A protein has these predicted regions:
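Short, acidic Ser/Thr/Gly-rich low-complexity loop/linker segments typical of extracellular
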Residues: 48-64
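N-terminal periplasmic accessory domains that precede
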Residues: 97-102, 144-147, 186-188, 202-203, ...
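Short, acidic, small-residue-rich periplasmic hinge/interaction motif at the N-terminus
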Residues: 42-46, 79-83, 93-137, 157-159, ...
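Conserved C-terminal beta-signal and adjacent last beta-strands/turns
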Residues: 538, 687-815
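Outer membrane beta-barrel strand-and-loop segments of large Gram-negative receptors
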Residues: 416, 425-429, 471-475, 579-581, ...
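Short acidic/polar hinge/loop motifs at secondary-structure boundaries
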Residues: 68, 144, 177-205
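Surface-exposed extracellular loop regions of Gram-negative outer-membrane beta-barrel proteins
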Residues: 509-511, 546-591, 612-634, 638, ...
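Outer-membrane beta-barrel translocator/receptor signature
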Residues: 212-219, 227-278, 301-305
Length: 815
């Protein structure tokens, strides 16, 4: 075994040394007319045999550049705005200096002032913060992943996971429409697509009425290239010490009209952790009723598989069609051991102790599919699109549970549960975009959706030798949500000022049905509640020639309560119970945000934003205690309520130091005040708490092959109604390397290096006081390898002409 391991290490070292056996090619870029050095020029090295990109760099402020490549025959290409493209054939046999490479002046030379006015590196227009990738010479030789690292607020870790402002609740769109990609497909896309095929990246942190998305933000990648010919196959495996292992494969075939995309994956994970809870229940008079301590250890083993298939067909220059389908089943099980000690003081003194052990299973299934059709009336953004989506999911869990009591007497209680839920919904949307001038565009759309859900719970207890149904812990229910939505937005540019008002109309019908009730219970728990809301938005932005960007936005969102929150049907758990609240009203949210950002091409950016999010009728869960005959003791009872009013007021600071396209250091900080006011039983309750968080990220790409990332973060305690979440923090670091002309990539990522991650909550309601601490195996090392085969030939399109999304005007994005 030792010899085998030694041989493997020697072989790996040999591969690494071969992959990094590089020769150095240097030179200086100068103007042919006067010999003046040309800074920040794109220099690329391509294989003569097949034109595959091998290495690239940008010249420094003195025109000097340096490339690394294995020995071989290459074509050197130098390009810069205002100059003719320079090409030279090279045979590399060792380090060599090419001396001065002279560029001739081209026919289309733009002054620096004009470039800054029309296409700055960073800009804010309406709700969008844009990173104009096509104007960044230092990133042209990288990948889409490299470009995203430079978009304000966007982070991509070494595994390819994308976050925005530190949250993963973000949708990635490509050419103004949702990508519908799986996580692994998206990772492959951004890690292989050349950065020079991207026109710009648009970041939307406060979506307008145009978007029905529930995500915290949207990242829209707008390309300036069309896949002309492509046959691409990739496969790999990801693993971690948690443990987790997941193999996957992806295949893409394309020609000028048709693209076929197929993906399959599998996975196994094993999560372990522990949880500790202390809880005290009080009467309305403030007298202690009981005190309970729980300590749990659990493990969960899960398997998953999945597949994705899509077809994109360009019928002609004016019509295109996209079809897709995905399916993701998962299954597994877990064990749990909980030790409980409870001291009861009211209504009767009693000490209870037991150990609960369970062996559970779970099965889940998710599938969705749809089609997207677009008709382009011209190549200036005038288009009509229709989309239809269907989604179905189902699953359940259950198992046997044993409670071994040691007090007040020794006995065993055995019960089993079977819980399932399922849904089969659909949604259709039609959107019409029409530019009414070179500086303005109007968009209108209509969406209709239907989302039903069925729930089922069955509980049986062992009585003697027979399993007897527990009718109070068994039920069936059906919920439906029917929504109709329409929106209209207008965007107009007045020089550097962009104005975008919009409005969205939403009609919802929420229903619930309970076909069975408890013995002797004649209550009708069915409900049917309609809701209607109007959601206006306004986004203003202004930018100067010196790249000062100002923005001001207002949005109003109105959310109807969830179906389960409206039900009065009591859900009896083993030691507590809960109900909904049919008197819940809609939640109104008014958001106001103002910001300033200054961008420098050679430094990066500094930004400051102030925001206010005020809510009325926010839904929170209140926890009470009361005696219930089913338990014959005082237990916890919870139900949702509308908080009287709440608001969050904060200040965000972000700084990005970016001396080149392959290195950046970013600091993000958020300081905010959370205020909540409500009344319960005629008694007012008021909470006011300041919280803060910050994150420091470093990303670098070395020798065009090796990525290095590191991040540290901290979030202080936060407050909600009668509840406080404890602070959390951690440090991550990672490496990713490309080998063999990006045919193979390997990453290593260390998560929560010092094992600091733990989570906790405390509750301090009038009747329930509790603390809980939760810890899982967060410290881990993740590794992965990806192999890629194929070639992608890109046909660049003129920036002023047609884009894949329908050629919307620059900065408008078809929105």
């Amino acid at each position: 075994m030792k010899k085998l391991v030694l041989s493997f290490i020697i072989a790996l070292m040999g591969i690494s040394s071969t992959a990094f056996a590089q020769s150095k090619i240097t030179g200086t870029i100068v103007e042919e007319a006067n010999g003046k050095a040309i800074p920040f020029v794109n220099v690329g090295l391509f294989r003569q045999a097949d034109s595959v990109f091998v290495s690239g760099a940008a010249s420094d402020d003195k025109g000097r550049f340096e490339l690394l490549a294995p020995n071989g025959d290459y074509r050197l290409q130098v390009s810069a705005i205002g100059f003719q493209t320079f090409e030279q054939l090279l045979t590399v046999k060792g380090n060599q200096d090419l001396g001065k490479l002279k560029l001739s002046e081209g026919a289309m030379k733009l002054s620096e002032v004009v470039i800054a006015e029309k296409r700055p590196l960073f800009a804010v227009e309406g709700e969008k913060t844009m990173y104009n990738v096509a104007e960044d010479p230092s990133i042209q030789t990288g990948t889409a992943s490299d470009a995203l690292q430079n978009a304000p607020g966007v982070e991509v870790d070494v595994e390819g996971n994308i976050t925005l402002r530190g949250t993963s609740s973000v949708e990635v769109w490509i050419n103004d429409k949702p990508s519908h990609m799986t996580a692994e497909n998206l990772k492959t896309y951004i890690q292989t697509m050349p950065a020079n095929s991207i026109d710009r990246v648009e970041v939307i942190t406060n979506p307008s009425a145009r978007y029905g998305s529930n995500a915290d933000g949207i990242i829209n990648i707008v390309t300036n290239a069309k896949i002309q010919k492509n046959e691409f196959f990739s496969f790999g495996v990801n693993a971690s010490t948690q443990p987790y292992i997941g193999p996957w494969m992806s295949y893409v075939w394309s020609n000028e009209k048709l693209t076929v995309n197929a993906y399959i994956n599998g996975g196994f994970s094993n999560w372990k952790g522990y949880n500790k809870v202390e809880q005290s229940l009080f009467t309305d008079e403030g007298i202690l009723a009981n005190h309970e301590r729980d300590s749990s250890n659990y493990s969960s083993k899960n398997y998953n598989a999945g597949g994705y298939f899509s077809i994109d067909y360009e019928i002609d220059t004016a019509n295109s069609l996209n079809l897709w389908f995905s399916c993701w089943p998962s299954w597994g099980g877990g064990t749990n051991y909980t030790a409980t000690q409870r001291e009861e003081f009211l209504p009767n003194p009693l000490n209870t102790a037991y150990i609960e052990s369970s062996d559970a299973y779970n099965r889940n299934f998710f599938a969705n599919g749809g089609l997207y059709y677009m008709h382009k009336f011209d190549n200036k953004g005038h288009n009509l699109s229709v989309s239809v989506n269907g989604m179905g999911w189902g699953g359940g869990n259950g198992g046997d549970v044993k409670r071994q009591f040691t007090a007040p007497i020794e006995y065993t209680h055995l019960f089993r549960q079977e819980n399932s839920s399922s849904s089969m919904g659909a949604e259709a949307e039609i959107v019409y975009n029409r530019p009414y001038s070179e500086n303005g565009e109007i968009s209108v759309g209509y969406t209709v959706g239907y989302d039903p859900e069925k729930q089922y719970l069955k509980t049986d207890s062992l009585v003697g030798e027979d399993w007897v149904n527990d009718v109070y812990r068994s039920y069936k229910a059906k919920f439906t949500n029917l929504n109709n939505e329409a929106f209209i937005t207008v965007q107009h540019k007045f020089g550097g000022l962009t104005v975008k008002p919009g409005i969205r109309f939403v009609s919802e019908l929420v229903t619930g049905e309970y076909p069975y009730t408890f013995p002797g219970d004649t209550t009708n728990y069915d409900f049917r509640k309609p809701f209607f809301s109007v959601r206006p938005s306004l986004h203003l932005s202004y930018r100067t020639e010196s790249m000062h960007n100002f923005k001001l936005s207002y949005t109003r969102r109105i959310a109807a309560p969830e179906a389960e929150q409206l039900s009065r049907f009591p859900l009896y758990h083993m030691d507590s119970y809960s109900t909904g609240n049919p008197d819940l009203e809609r939640v109104y949210t008014n958001s106001l945000e103002a910001g300033w950002t200054k961008y420098w091409n050679s430094f990066g950016s500094v930004g400051l934003s102030a925001y206010y999010r005020g809510k009325s009728n926010e839904v929170n869960t209140i926890q009470l205690s009361e005696y219930h005959w089913l338990y014959d003791r005082i237990v916890q009872y919870s139900y949702p309520v509308n908080v009287g009013k709440s608001h969050t007021t904060g200040l965000e600071y972000n700084m990005m130091y970016r001396p080149s396209g392959f290195f950046n250091l970013r600091f993000y900080a958020n300081l905010y005040d959370s205020y909540i006011y409500t009344e319960y039983n005629g008694q007012p309750y008021e909470f006011d708490k300041w919280s803060y968080s910050f994150r420091l990220n470093m990303w670098a790409k070395l020798w065009n092959k090796l990525e290095v990332t590191a991040s540290g973060y901290y979030s202080s305690p936060t407050q909600t109604l009668f509840s406080e979440r404890k602070g959390w923090y951690g440090i991550n670091a990672g490496l990713r390397a490309d080998f063999f002309d990006r045919k193979m990539s390997v990453y290593v990522n260390a998560n929560d290096i010092f094992n600091w991650n733990s989570f906790g909550n405390s509750n301090n309601s009038p009747s329930v006081q509790s603390t809980s601490n939760y810890k899982f195996n967060s410290r881990s090392v993740a590794v992965g390898v990806t192999f890629r085969f194929g070639k992608m030939e890109l046909e660049q399109r003129a920036r002023q002409g047609e884009g894949e999304s329908g050629g919307s005007p620059q900065g408008m994005g078809g929105m």
